[in-house]
Amino acid sequence: MPQRLYTYPPLLRGRLLQRYKRFFADIELDSGETITAHCPNTGPMTGVCQMGNLVYVSKSDNPKRKLAYTWELIEVTDNEPTWVGVNTGLPNRVVQALLEQRCLPVLGDYGEVQREVPYGENSRIDFRLTGDRPIYVEVKNTTWTAGRLALFPDTVTTRGQKHLRELTAILLEARAVMLYFINRGDCTAFAPGDSADPTYGQLLRTGIAAGLEVYPCQFQISPEGIDFLGVAPLQL
C-alpha cells in the first residue's frame, strides 16, 4: 500500500515556457500571469524539461526571496501522463521520513537516524543509521528513463563516482547502502546510466560485488504529495 511521506503546500498550476541559466523557469499560470520561478534542479533534467507541459509551482511568503515561486512538478507523457518531481531539495527530506518510519524492512534494526555525518575523503554521508554495525546511506535522485527503466546518472558525475568509492571502502567497518530515489511513478525497474557515465556503472557493479546494498525506491508523485511504493528491481 502506498505510504504518504510528504504533503505539498497549496500549489499553482501552469505551463512551462522555458528553462534557462539552470536556475530559472518562465511559467504561464492558469490565471494567465507569466512568472519566473526558481528551478531547484541544477542537472540537465534529461527527457523531463519539456516546453509546454503542465507544471506546478509553490509560492513563498518570504519577502526576502528574489523569486517567490519554486518549480515543484512537471507532467511528462513518455509512458502515460506522469508527474515528475523537480525540487531536488525534497528527496532527502522524504528519505529521512522513510528511514524514521522504518519503511524499509530490509535494513533490519537500527537506532538513530543521523544526517550529514562526516566520512570518507572530506565527504558527508546523507544518513548514518546507528547500531552494532552502522549503516551508511547515500541518496541519489533520478528522473531519467528509458521506457519504464529508471536510470542514474544522466551525465558524468565525478562526485557520484567518489561517493561509490567511499561507500565501497567503508564496507570493512559498516554496511553501505546506495538508495536511488525514483522521482516519478511510471518506472518498474532501475539500472545504472552506462551511456551517460560508464565509469559510474562500473564502480556501482564493483561495489555490489564487494557487498554494497542498492535499493531503487519507487515513489508516486502527485500535486498532493509523495507516496512510497516500494523497492524496484535492479538491472545490471
From Swiss-Prot:
Q: Which CDD domains match?
A: SfsA-like_bacterial (cd22359)
InterPro entries in the record, alphabetically? SfsA, SfsA_C, SfsA_N
Q: Name one Pfam family in it.
A: SfsA
GO molecular function per UniProt: DNA binding
Q: Which HAMAP family match?
A: SfsA
Family according to the record: Belongs to the SfsA family.
NCBIfam families xref list = sfsA
Q: What is this protein called?
A: Sugar fermentation stimulation protein homolog
Q: What is the organism field in this record?
A: Synechococcus elongatus (strain ATCC 33912 / PCC 7942 / FACHB-805)
